[in-house]
Amino acid sequence: MKRVTGIGGIFFKAKDPVALRAWYQKHLGVNVQPWGGAAFVWADDAGNAYKGTTIWNIGDANNDYYAPSKSSFMINYRVADLAALLKALREEGCQVLEKTDDSEYGKFGWVMDPEGNKVELWQPPPGQ
């Protein structure tokens, strides 16, 4: 079974998300959108876009989306078959969170790594 197929997103908290987003936009050219992040469209070596994006987002330090992790970041990994991967991780003794989510954005599940970081696993909707 193929497990991780790519990075779907990088999410981190900031004490002053507005100022930090502005810094990234000014100094690194990140095209920060009103929702607080950017979507990097995938391209091949020739620069031709193809289906897939990597999300980059700065959130407020007080949000609890990363709970139970105490980390200031979370990485979202693309996976081919979320249900099969979560089952395999449970069988391997990993701390898989019970909650899953199925929305128009795809299927989501979470596992805690050995250092207490919450890892988001994302199965994109068909066609992505």
Predicted feature locations:
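Vicinal oxygen chelate
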Residues: 1-15, 35, 61-128
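Core segments of cupin and vicinal oxygen chelate
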Residues: 2-5, 11-56, 91
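A generic fold-level signal
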Residues: 5, 50, 69-70, 103
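Residues that cap or initiate secondary-structure elements
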Residues: 18, 46, 81-83, 127
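Short linear motifs in intrinsically disordered
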Residues: 28-31, 77-78, 98-101
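Short amphipathic beta-strand starts and helix->beta connectors
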Residues: 56-61, 94
